[in-house]
Amino acid sequence: MITRRALLAGAAALPAARAWAQGAPGIAQRLDDAPAAGIKRDLLIQWGDRVAYDAPPFAALAPNLAAAEGQFGWDTRVLAAMASPRVEDGIPRAVLAVGHPTLDPAMAFPDGRDRPEIAGAMQGASLINIQRRGGVWLVTEGGFQMRRLHARTLCRMGGAGGPARGVFGITGGAATPWGSLLLTEGEGAAWARRLPGVEAAQTGHVVELDPFEPQSVPVKRAALGRFGARDVAAALAADGRAVVFMADGRDGGLLWRFVSDGPAAEPNALDQGTLYAARFEAGALRWIALPADADPYGAAVARGANSLGRPVALALDPNGARLCLALREFPRNPAGAVVEILFAARDPAGDTAIVENLMEGRVPPRPRPGREPALVPAWPVAPSSLCLDGQGNLLVGTAQPARDSALPDALYALPLEGRARGEPSLAYITPLGAALGGVAVVPGAATWVAGVAHPGAGMGAQFAAPRSRWPHFRDGEPPRGGVVALSRGG
């Protein structure tokens, strides 16, 4: 069996892990919106803020379809941060991709009554121009790449397919080495049931678009399978073909891979290729090729593909050395885990890989009734979003199913090498009731951007009576999820 040392031998050494976030031995159970020492938090954008240049001001008490289609969506999942084309003024800029997977009517609408058409406008995805001025990252008002994708966005099906309506339930995404953006409709099936007139067969896809051209038509790449992938990551094979990894977040979900027939540089490279499913066995992984005309899941299971748990998030080393995978319901551990997949010969299109546990979640002790909130170990529970920071750390965001957990959701940094490998450092604690909704690294900057998803949520919470009114804490104003920038120097 190939050893980990042999697999990486001869490769350029990865940067040593840097303790960018400050470690913490424990945190109080009810800490709320707290960056670690030395980290500055700035709010970038929030639910209802303008994305389209002509969107009206946010009016939470009067939800409106036309307004919602031009405003930042209700739910938040940071997907990718891409360097903007360089200009001569030297101002750091980036394009931020954010998904809006779901919408809870009780928290989004004043009377708690669902308004499916407006809800369909509040979900989907947003592309945001950001820039750094005066040491602070800001949204660029009227930025060229700013756009909203929602239930009425015109799309097309890949291959010989025709037009398609809408982008639905975006739970994951990734920038590709060939310059496009991939989005996953992980909650697409739920929106197909919720919205009238939506064809179920046109949901649940991986969607590809040009993030730098606001008029580009999103394409649903049917060749990658239709199973509502939870997340996606993209790489180049050693021979230049496109490689796309997909995490199927269903119970018993599999890890998938698509390898294009032709070079990734071809405009429709993702329309022709081979779909694979992973078989895990004794610290190793083997890819199983699937026939093009079969049901992918049935064919995969029949050929021996298996699951380590529920795959929910991916992070890919751009140098091709490793893929990190977050799992829910890891065997014998309900708190989940993160595993590291090391490609043979550093080729993501290779047939085999080594699999190693990087970190397992820990379930915190329950608080005792009537007692003051105690300190509990600052350790990830239910890892749900991943990002490699380029400095030797894996960023891990948590999203626990129960909103009354003893431990708040948070962002952690895990070194990948050295003596501290797999030991988490706490970077940011989300507001009360919120989950950590994805994380990305701004290219060329010592800044992370993280999503704050559904703040104020919890048992019995509603629009008029949330658990928190983050971020402004104004009477009568609902909590508003959004994106924060986390930078050194706070």
Predicted segments with their positions:
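N-terminal secretory signal peptides and thylakoid transit peptides that target proteins
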Residues: M1-L14
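Conserved small-residue
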Residues: L14-G490
